[in-house]
Amino acid sequence: MQVMHPVCCGIDVHQKSIVCCILDGPLTSNEPKKYQTTFGTTTKELKAALDWILEHQVTHVFFESTGQYWIPLFNIFSDSDLELVLANPQHIKNVPGRKTDVKDAEWIAQLGRCGLINQSYIPSQEVLQLRYLTRYRLSVKQRLTQIKNHIHVILQRANIKITSYLTDIFC
């Protein structure tokens, strides 16, 4: 595989930790130096991860879009000059053999180093907030409907036939 990025970082993202693997070597080298470490996912720890990555003069950072866990990492890292590449997990084949977070991070770094990871769509902050609010509104409406239905059941079991007189008891 042809090397596209001499110094890059692959990150395996989880709820409570991120595993970073930096591959550093010339474009002609198939044996780059490897630096690996694990950080937590608090703001302070993510900033420490960013500092560690910048100390190694990384130019490209590759990570998977794992649930919502990638968003805090992206928010903190996007303030830097790093080229951030969010990968769809389905497009990154699993590591052959035994699966570990360290191997996953290295595999992501290797694929990214060779330019084999395509950038996923990253919505703007406004779109992300609108999606969140829309989903939240839908969940509130669904809960309200469940509560109303439950009240109807309670009234019927108590032989209170209020719905015979009112079309909507919640107006």
Residue ranges and their predicted role:
Residues L138-C171:
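Glycine-rich, often acidic, oxyanion-interacting loops/wings at catalytic, nucleic-acid
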Residues Q15, G67, H91:
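Short, glycine/acidic-enriched loop or turn micro-motifs at the edges of active sites
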Residues L27-H60:
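Nucleic-acid-processing active sites and adjacent nucleic-acid-binding tracks
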Residues R131-S139:
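Short, charge/polar-rich alpha-helical segments
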Residues V58-Y69:
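Short glycine-rich phosphate-binding loop at a beta-alpha junction
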Residues Q2-G25, I108:
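Gly/Thr-rich phosphate-binding beta-strand-loop-beta motif of the actin/hexokinase/Hsp70
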Residues S78, L84-Y132, I169-F170:
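Short alpha-helix plus adjacent loop in nuclease-associated cores
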